[in-house]
Structures are given as structure tokens and as C-alpha cells.
From Swiss-Prot:
Keyword Lipid metabolism: no
Protein name as it appears in the record: 2-isopropylmalate synthase
Family in the record: Belongs to the alpha-IPM synthase/homocitrate synthase family. LeuA type 2 subfamily.
UniProt keywords, alphabetically: Amino-acid biosynthesis, Branched-chain amino acid biosynthesis, Cytoplasm, Leucine biosynthesis, Magnesium, Metal-binding, Transferase
Subunit organization: Homodimer.
Cellular component aspect of the GO annotation: cytoplasm
Biological processes per GO annotation: L-leucine biosynthetic process
All copies of domain Pyruvate carboxyltransferase, residue ranges: 32-306
Pathways per UniProt: Amino-acid biosynthesis; L-leucine biosynthesis; L-leucine from 3-methyl-2-oxobutanoate: step 1/4
Function: Catalyzes the condensation of the acetyl group of acetyl-CoA with 3-methyl-2-oxobutanoate (2-ketoisovalerate) to form 3-carboxy-3-hydroxy-4-methylpentanoate (2-isopropylmalate).
Cofactor(s) this protein cannot do without: Mg(2+)
E.C. numbers: 2.3.3.13
Organism: Mycobacterium ulcerans (strain Agy99)
């Protein structure tokens, strides 16, 4: 590959030196100001830009989620955008606590058209920009620093003039030195300070300086250093809201945003699920839920992540990848056996700790391996947390049997049954395919519940001991190889009595382990019983399910005998 055609960032732009940087030691303990730009930066990157109906659906979603600043379009560049801005203003769709933002270049006629679109709105941020990078100054504008700075300051003056024509609107201003990451820091500061001289911001009405990684050009620490330098050196900093707008060209937009925020920024612009030009804008869902996962309130409601994703997919006509953080179909799913086992044990420990604390599990500190957040907190269920394929082990099988079918399999039975499931998975077209919960249940029923040869229990009558330690007797009707027989026995309980009775007709059975549980809560709950037995010297497991625990335990013995005869 022709690596000689490329050069280090320090050679292409400059070597950013912040030797006394403080951002590496800072811990993010609050949410930034958010601005969602799905309707503008996101929309302009779509193969088929949003229709008015899709735009409105996206806007309403962002409002419901709690975004207070929403960039709604580029009204001077598109009649569709102009009409949409007019629609949400005239129809009263903008809540009192939401400020719309509109984008414009610095040309006078475009600024004028932008203000026309916003007439009648209560609160508006006018976002004007021009590119300041070394490369664009040379190849696009063919202009020197002074000329490019003049574009920005002339645009600022025109914005102030137009705002005066609409005194009933609360105007705020945002300026972006576009392609900031390709601009010398000292020059970026110079242009921003010159714009501020025109706008005359105050702490009560600050200007927003948005420093976009229009193209991501270096590692996130370089971006963070540049943000800390700008935050320290901008004039009149108390009257400035420092905003970030990272793109994802190098795949590190989230890291750049988080480090830039730690470095002194106040605000972040992005799109839900990272839509945007080329590789996209920074993902607002990832940023917000990263905060949430560390106990910081993002001030945005992600409690129904699937509804959010469906709406975004509909509006953008683009799918959200299955592995996208927090929102993808597979992000809370484990196929690996060791992962499944750890998750299963973690959930069991959570349940145990909640019971010990007499608390609801939803109120407990979340601590489950491999799951950074509780899927339920974003509206997911546990049904898809563990899925079984040829890479899975007993933990995954045990989890699904308990979560989906109410069976808490003993550990050795987990191991035995997981082998059968692995054989099924490896036999799926020879490709290690997935085994669904239904397929798993069908296999379990076929292996442990269905066989009726050589032994089938028909009915029984149990006479319990009147005193503890007394003898229980049983009379049972069974079929042996299809022929009905009456058997009787006694023992220290129904199970022992039944085993004794079976011995009288030639079945050599010794119970090695036994457990039981209700499969659900309530008076009508089914009971499950598990028997590990030695049948004619062969150790096998049997399972019984019935409305009564006595019948379930006898069925488990019958299951073990029939499995031993295979």
C-alpha cells in the first residue's frame, strides 16, 4: 500500500502541545448540554432525505426523549427544510423548553432566508459556519487567513442585523470554524474571538463555539488537547458555550467526544445511532448510555431503546447494525459458554442478594458479568440475553431452561443435557447453528419426558406415615412393555416406596440424588422433580413434571428407568 502518500497529523496541520493538560485526571460526573442534529447533519447524509412526515416523526421522537436543543434543518438550502421549519413553528409543535437550531452559511442572502424561516419562533439558535482549515483555504477558497476570517465576521454582523428585525424571538448564535481539526489552533481561536467581538455575548446570553471534527484526523487525545487549549485561551470564556461535533472517520468519535468533554467542553452535537456524512456523527445513544452505565444521569430517556431504534430506522431508511452499542439486536446476547455461565451465575447472585436484602432486584446495584447495563433498563427483556449455538455450554442451556421454561436443572443434569444440545447445534447444516428455546424444549421433552417404554406409570395411591420417621406405603398401577401390572411397596417416603415397589417386578433402581421445585408461583403451579438414579448399574437422570410434587417425583423415576433402557 502507498503509505508514502500520507503523513502524520503534526506535519499536515501542527503539533499540538499541552504539556500541563488536566483532562486525563478528570472524571465525567455530569451530562453535557446535548444538541441532536439528526434532522440536518444526519438528514443531508441520507440516500433518500427524509420526507416531511419522516422529519416530523424524528422531531417528535427527539422531543419525547428530552433533547432541549434540536437542529431542525438548513432552511436556506432546501425548500423542504424551509417548509418543515415553518410547519413546526406555525403548528405549535415546539415545546416551550425546546430551542430549535438552524444552519446557514455566511452568505447574506442565505442568512436572510434563514431568519425568514424562523419568524414567529420563541427561541432559536442560528448556527453559521465557514471552513477554516489549511486545506480548504488553499483548494476551496484560495484565500488567505484574513479573507477567511472576514467571511466569518461578515456573517456574524449580518446575523446580528437580521435578528434585530425579529425582536419577539429570543435569538442565540452558534459559530463553527468548520474543518476545525484541520485548522491551526491559534488561527481557530483568532477567528472565534473575532466573531465574538461582533456578537458581543454575555454570561447570560453566551455564544456557542462549535469545534467540529468535520473530518476525524488524529487520535482522540489530540482532539482533547486541542479542546483544552481552546477552553483555556478563548477570550471571554465565561460568555462561551464550547461545543463538540465529532465525526467518526477513524472510528473514535465517541472517545473524542468523551475526552473533549473532560477537556473543558460544555456541549455535544450528534445523531442517534451515529448517522451522518461518511462514517457518521458521534452516536448520541452511545454517549448517553455510557454515562448511564456509570451512574450519571444523561438527562435523556433511553428507556425504550427498541422504539427509538425503530423510529430512527424508519426515518433514516437505514438499519442499525446488530452490534451497535446498546441498541443493536445482539448487544445483550451471549453465545459463548463461559460468558453464559457467568451471566447466569451473576443473575442468580443478584436474585439471592435481593432476597437477602428484602428488596426488589430492580432496585439492586447492577453487577452481572458481560452486561454493562441491565437490558430491562432500556426496555429489553432477558429472553435474548443468552442464545445457544455450538459455542455454548451448560450455563446458556441452564439459563434458557429456567428463564423460558421454568426448570432449574441440577448442575450435573445441566452438563448432561448441554451435550445433547451441542450435538443438535453442531448438526445444524454442519455450521454450528443456533438452537432456539422451542427447539431446546422439544429436545428436552423428547429426551426426558416422552419415553413410555419399558415403564409407564398409570396411577398410584399413597398411604403416608402418621408420624415422622414412619413408613409410607404405595399401591401403583403401571405398564411394563405395554402390559398393565399392579405393584406395591413401602419406604420412608413416596419415592422410596415406589422404588421398593419397582424392585418387586425386576427394576434395580437406587436414587443417588433428588431435587424438586415449583415451576412458578401460585396455587396452580406445576412441580418439577429431578432424580439421578443408578438403574441396573447405569447412572442416569430422570425428570418429572406434574401438578403434585409426589406425582412429579414418581414420573422422574420412571423417566430415569426408560432412559437407562435406551
Amino acid at each position: 500500500m502507498p503509505v508514502n502518500r500520507y503523513r502524520p497529523f503534526a506535519e499536515e496541520v501542527e503539533h499540538i502541545r499541552v504539556t500541563d493538560r488536566t483532562w486525563p485526571d478528570r472524571v465525567i460526573d455530569r451530562a453535557p448540554l446535548w444538541c441532536a442534529v439528526d434532522l440536518r447533519d444526519g438528514n443531508q447524509a441520507l440516500i433518500d432525505p427524509m420526507s416531511p412526515a419522516r422529519k416530523r416523526r424524528m422531531f417528535d421522537l427527539l422531543v419525547r426523549m428530552g433533547y432541549k436543543e434540536i437542529e431542525v434543518g438548513f432552511p436556506s438550502a432546501s425548500q423542504t427544510d424551509f417548509d418543515f421549519v415553518r410547519e413546526i413553528i406555525t403548528e405549535g409543535a415546539i415545546p416551550d423548553d425546546v430551542t430549535i437550531q438552524v444552519l446557514t452559511q455566511c452568505r447574506p442572502e442565505l442568512i436572510e432566508r434563514t431568519f425568514e424561516a424562523c419568524a414567529g419562533a420563541s427561541k432559536v439558535i442560528v448556527h453559521f459556519y465557514n471552513s477554516t482549515s489549511i486545506l480548504q483555504r488553499r483548494v476551496v477558497f484560495r484565500a488567505d487567513r484574513a479573507a477567511v476570517e472576514a467571511i466569518a465576521t461578515d456573517g456574524a454582523r449580518r446575523c446580528v442585523e437580521e435578528a434585530a428585525k425579529y425582536p419577539d424571538t429570543q435569538w442565540r448564535f452558534e459559530y463553527s470554524p468548520e474543518s476545525y481539526t484541520g485548522t491551526e489552533l491559534e488561527y481557530a481561536k483568532q477567528v472565534c474571538d473575532a466573531v465574538a467581538e461582533v456578537i458581543q455575548p454575555t454570561p447570560e446570553n453566551p455564544i456557542i463555539f462549535n469545534l467540529p471534527a468535520t473530518v476525524e484526523m488524529a487520535t482522540p487525545n489530540v482532539y482533547a488537547d486541542s479542546i483544552e487549549w481552546m477552553s483555556r485561551n478563548l477570550a471571554n470564556r465565561e460568555s462561551v458555550i464550547l461545543s463538540l461535533h465529532p465525526h467518526n472517520d477513524r472510528g473514535t468519535a465517541v472517545a473524542a467526544a468523551e475526552l473533549g468533554f473532560a477537556a473543558g467542553a460544555d456541549r455535544i452535537e450528534g445523531c442517534l445511532f451515529g448517522n451522518g456524512e461518511r462514517t457518521g456523527n458521534v452516536c448520541l445513544a452511545t454517549l448517553g448510555l455510557n454515562l448511564f452505565s456509570r451512574g450519571v444521569d444523561p438527562q435523556i430517556d433511553f428507556s425504550n431503546i427498541d422504539e427509538i431504534r425503530r423510529t430512527v430506522e424508519y426515518c433514516n431508511q437505514l438499519p442499525v447494525p446488530e452490534r451497535h452499542p446498546y441498541g443493536g439486536d445482539l448487544v445483550y446476547t451471549a453465545f459463548s459458554g463461559s460468558h453464559q455461565d457467568a451471566i447466569n451465575k451473576g443473575l442468580d447472585a443478584m436474585e439471592f442478594d435481593a432476597d437477602a436484602a428484602d428488596s426488589d432486584m430492580d432496585d439492586m446495584l447492577w453487577q452481572v458479568p458481560y452486561l454493562p447495563i441491565d437490558p430491562k433498563d432500556v426496555g429489553r427483556t432477558y429472553e435474548a440475553v443468552i442464545r445457544v449455538n455450538s459455542q455454548s455450554g451448560k450455563g446458556g442451556v441452564a439459563y434458557i431452561m429456567k428463564a423460558d421454561h421454568g426448570l432449574a436443572l441440577p448442575r450435573r443434569l445441566q452438563i448432561e443435557f448441554s451435550r445433547a444440545i451441542q450435538e443438535i447445534a453442531e448438526g445444524s447444516a454442519g455450521e454450528g447453528g443456533e438452537v432456539s428455546p422451542k427447539e431446546m424444549w422439544d429436545a428436552f421433552a423428547e429426551e426426558y419426558l416422552a419415553p413410555v417404554r419399558p415403564l409407564e406409570r398409570i396411577k398410584q395411591r399413597v398411604i403416608a406415615a402418621e408420624e415422622d420417621g414412619g413408613t409410607t406405603s404405595i399401591d401403583a398401577t403401571v405398564k411394563i412393555d405395554g402390559k398393565e401390572a399392579e405393584i406395591s411397596g413401602s419406604g420412608n417416603g413416596p419415592l422410596a416406596a415406589f422404588v421398593h415397589a419397582l424392585g418387586t417386578v425386576g427394576f434395580d433402581v437406587a436414587v443417588l440424588d433428588y431435587s424438586e421445585h415449583a415451576m412458578s408461583a401460585g396455587d396452580d403451579a406445576q412441580a418439577a422433580a429431578y432424580v439421578e438414579a443408578s438403574v441396573a448399574g447405569k447412572t442416569v437422570w430422570g425428570v418429572g413434571i406434574a401438578p403434585s410434587i409426589t406425582t412429579a417425583s414418581l414420573r422422574a423415576v420412571v423417566s430415569a428407568i426408560n432412559r437407562a433402557s435406551r
